[in-house]
Amino acid sequence: MSLPVVAVVGRPNVGKSHLFNRVIGEATAIVSDEAGTTRDRHFGEAEWAGRQFWLVDTGGLVEDSHLLMDTAIRRQVMQAIEEADLMLFVVDAKVGVHPSDARIVDILRNSQKPWMLVANKVDDPASTDFYEFFRLGVTDVYPVSAQNGKGSGDLLDAVVANIPEVEEEERDAVRVAVIGRPNVGKSSFVNRLLGEDRLVVSDESGTTRDAIDAPMRYHDTDLVFVDTAGLRRQSRIDDGVEFYSALRTRRAIDSSDVCILMIDATEGLQNQDLKIATMAWEAGRGLILVINKWDLYEDKTDKSADKFKKEAVEKVPYLKFVPFLFTSAISGQRVTKVLDIVLSVQEQRTRRISTSEVNDALGDLLARLQPPQAAGREVKLNYATQVEIEPPTIAVFGNNPEAIPEHYVRFLHNGFRERWGFTGAPLRIILRRKNS
């Protein structure tokens, strides 16, 4: 499920970032206890009136000293048009209509994308003359004060009325996102799998751009490689590409069942690779690490692959549960093996263990190690059951779940994995009070 994108655009110093923070604050921010899953410096996931959407703050894209201001603003708006489902064009009600505002309106009007004009810094609608913005030919102006929150509720009502409905997809096919840093060989890998002449595309309405899904059938299973438009096409705009790539990556992850993270073997595992891997893992998606350009890896021996994986696991321990595949997209070496791994990971991700089996496993683990006491009192774990799939989630019930330390949760996690594997799939452990 890929959420709509709402981009905040406008001149510098009109309060875009303040509005972003206000809206994220007024809306129900969808947060997680796990770091890095919902909030970024420039975009956040929000919910209003039961509707979810991404809100994007483009403020950081303009303050580039080497660019002329009008050029920077125009590029900012053009990027938003390419990426977003709805633009919020923010103007300064205290300054009034600025010459750049009229030029931005012309761009937005020609874009054929929905947009709304938001007059910021309207602390008191009765005393602020924001009506002059109707001179720009708009039918509605939404007065707000990012400072004190006035008008933000009406604005959010209008936002959710103007973004496309998101319908839960019936996923008969396994949806696969190929993600990773630029220039690691993602497009070559997909083309090698599918073949250019076999690339079947379908335009999806209501997306941020013309996203392309590439379907194929393998061993009687339908696979769909999602968001391949971003893999095959370079952005028409150079500035701010990294800014939007994180959002594109997150949307591709949200639309997928299994993520293939491409790594450049010649560059090794970079911090950005780890951030992307964690983004997919914490989102509950299946994960496969494909080490591309393995044919170019220097001083390779028969132990190089094991060494590469060992170093990766030392950096991020959960990667020991993730399958690695060492390939060359250019030569085709081992590329098609990923299809069997995708099917296996999705099977693990949708696997359901009977309650009796889960309790047998819990009993064995308790026989090996009891949870530590809390404040001199015994902590008991009574029973466990699997409550979810995609990803597998096991609830463990006891008399004082809040007192169980993190290291014991890891012990349970590792013990369950020893028994069932769940290779490539996140495994979540939930602690609950008995009879809750």
From Swiss-Prot:
Residues 4-167, 174-350 form the EngA-type G domain. Residues 351-435 form the KH-like domain. Keywords: GTP-binding, Nucleotide-binding, Repeat, Ribosome biogenesis. Disulfide bonds: none annotated. It comes from the Bacteria. GTP 2 binds at residues 180-187, 227-231, 292-295. SUPFAM superfamilies: P-loop containing nucleoside triphosphate hydrolases. Pfam families: KH_dom-like, MMR_HSR1. CDD domains: EngA1 (cd01894), EngA2 (cd01895). GTP 1 binds at residues 10-17, 57-61, 120-123. One of its GO terms (biological process) is ribosome biogenesis. GO terms for molecular function: GTP binding; ribosome binding. The keyword Ribonucleoprotein does not apply. PROSITE patterns: G_ENGA (PS51712). Belongs to the TRAFAC class TrmE-Era-EngA-EngB-Septin-like GTPase superfamily. EngA (Der) GTPase family. Associates with the 50S ribosomal subunit. GTPase that plays an essential role in the late steps of ribosome biogenesis. This is GTPase Der. It comes from Gemmatimonas aurantiaca (strain DSM 14586 / JCM 11422 / NBRC 100505 / T-27).
